[in-house]
């Protein structure tokens, strides 16, 4: 597990099934800025709330989703405050009474931490709309650009805001657009570069420089260049610099030991 098929393949996998939750509830939590949004995330775990999902998204990606779906789900302004970022959080439990009590506790914590409001998606239709919007992000981006590339990194949760602020600053040097969202509970970020009017050659050149820069920053903050999508061919060129010569020699040595004929997923290490 984790070797991306370079050391072996899974031929049999026992799975343990657990009962589906009796009740679930989702909360849309809007913030004026990304910093307050991300700073709230550790408070869920410090207070033992145990969310099943904690997703963050910036306003730009939400707007793209709404243009794609033709439906508005997330508020853009609350009591005169312009919204810049959101958390979408899901909890499960044995009863709605339990979840309503939990929602009150969560609301007190997040509002004190800078949230502008807490919107409750407590019906099947509301939950479906909220998560349909979240699930549509990639399709929404693809619908609006002829060329795109993705950076899939992971950084410590307490470094997310700092990292994305850096990414936004670096992106201003280039002519493409950047849209981001991710799994705030574990620091896994999806950063998409969208070509706008750039031709393919220019876009690839600019994105290559941009990616090298932000991968380096992720490493400086204690992160990794791949959160969940793997290295593959796309990030192979960045792996050597990130891992360093010693780690690369170790990985190649392990590969040669277990797969001396280089049969399994060749050409990746």
Describe these PLM feature segments:
Residues 1-227, 231-269:
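Noncatalytic alpha-helical scaffold of FAD-dependent oxidoreductases
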